[in-house]
Design a protein with these regions (language model features):
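Generic detection of short hydrophobic beta-strand segments and adjacent strand-loop junctions
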Residues: 5-21, 169-187, 251, 256-260
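Residues in well-ordered beta-strands of folded domains
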Residues: 18, 200-202, 211-213
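Residue-level signal for secondary-structure boundary elements
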Residues: 42-49, 53-57, 115-123, 281, ...
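Positively charged, helix-rich recognition surfaces that bind polyanionic ligands
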Residues: 3-5, 210-384
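Acidic carboxylate diad motif detector
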Residues: 66-204, 360
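Long, compositionally biased intrinsically disordered regions
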Residues: 1-106, 110, 281, 288-301
Length: 384
């Protein structure tokens, strides 16, 4: 039975942006406005999380109905409930200083994550806090006048760039090598073929990135809903998969399996980077101080970032290859076999002071990427 699945899904693309203004003083003022909005977003997020936590934990003598009617001190006007109290407090504190649409989006994100944390169990972790690297969301209508136009770069060459205006600030996108096809997606957004959703700005040092969220149609793929691709996530071989049910039950037989990646390919380079980190930690003892911790640990942070980037790239590649195998064999479902058992075993080894597996192999990141790429083509992903 062939099933043709076609739905829409929201994808996120990371694109570098910068203020497009020739006047030096005006450009500086625009950047100050962006960073001030970022600081306000961080304050609003932490304030909202604190308010929600206080309402849930500091008034045990009140009934649930009374908690919904509690108002905050200092809020003028009508009484505010638990749902809209954070927005009322934020509007009183920051109205006129930042875009209130951005403030509303921040509050919605914080409330959603707070409710998710409550379901998982607040006692299992500390209250979520927000720092300066958090994405600052803006409504899609705030990204005005999105268009492509010719411009002259610093070398006098004519190029075509993408320009838009965000809360009165002229900005331009920098696509770079564009191996992910971001320019094509933005062109379709500008033409009206794709719908732009609430997107965010993320500040990374001196760079600003646009986390562009776009509602795109899923790829039309003919899949057999009854056909299943069985996959094992392992350390020796990152992914082993098969469409044969008998082979899936006889994992150790080594027959009829398709292997994705090798232990040497993934772990060897990662262990090299970890060795660089260890050397930096040792050498930091002998470096000259007096210029701050950030300067002293600069090399260490560099290699930490390299390791994260390497792991993310590899997991993207492995998950892409697994979904391609499922599409090739027209499998409508991917089953991760014995995955829960393997994760429990890894946790036990970690508790026995043998942290190699969880330290060097990323079960959770790989699972999330497989599910994300599977949804793009209509493939269901399940665990056993």
């Amino acid at each position: 039975m062939d099933v043709k699945k076609k739905n829409n899904m929201v994808i996120t693309r990371k694109i570098e942006v910068f203020v497009c203004e020739d006047d030096k003083d005006l450009r500086k003022a625009y950047y100050e406005k962006l960073y001030a909005s970022r600081d306000i977003a961080v304050k609003v997020a932490n304030m909202c999380a604190s308010h929600l936590f206080a309402l849930d934990n500091t008034m045990p003598y009140l009934s649930d109905e009374d908690k919904e009617k509690v108002t905050f001190l200092g809020v003028s006007g009508d009484a505010s409930t638990k749902r809209n109290a954070p927005y009322v407090a934020a509007s009183e504190a920051f109205k006129g200083q930042a875009d209130m649409g951005m403030v509303s989006c921040v509050l919605q994100n914080v409330q959603k994550m707070y409710q998710d944390d409550r379901k998982k169990g607040m006692w299992a972790r500390s209250l979520r806090s927000y720092k300066s690297n958090m994405p600052v969301p803006y409504q899609a209508k705030r990204f005005a006048n999105l268009h492509f136009a010719e411009y002259t770069n610093g070398n006098g060459e004519k190029r075509e760039g993408c320009f838009f205006t965000l809360t009165g600030i002229p900005m331009q996108m920098r696509f770079g090598r564009d191996r992910s096809g971001n320019r094509t997606i933005v062109e379709r957004v500008a033409d009206g073929d794709y719908k732009m959703c609430t997107s965010s700005l993320q500040f990374d040092g001196k760079k600003i990135f646009l986390l562009l969220c776009v509602d795109v149609p899923k790829k039309e793929v003919k899949l057999d809903a009854k056909k299943i691709l069985f996959a094992y996530l392992d350390v020796d071989v990152p992914i082993r998969c098969t469409t044969d049910v008998k082979a899936a039950k006889e994992y150790d037989s080594g027959m009829k399996w398709f292997e994705i990646g090798t232990k040497e390919e993934f772990l060897y380079r990662r262990r090299q980077i970890q060795e660089f980190v260890r050397r930096c930690q040792i050498n930091n003892k002998y470096t000259t101080g007096g210029k701050g911790r950030k300067k002293k640990c600069q090399a260490l942070e560099h290699w930490h970032e390299k390791e994260l980037n390497y792991v993310g790239t590899k997991l993207h590649m492995y998950s892409r290859m697994l979904v391609d195998v499922a599409m090739k064999h027209k499998c409508g479902k991917i089953v991760l076999v014995n995955q829960k058992e393997r994760e429990e075993k890894a946790k036990e080894e970690n508790m026995r002071c043998e942290p190699f597996l969880l330290r060097n192999w990323s079960y959770y990141g790989l699972k999330d990427k497989i599910k994300y790429k599977g949804r793009m083509v209509g493939i269901e992903v399940a665990e056993e």
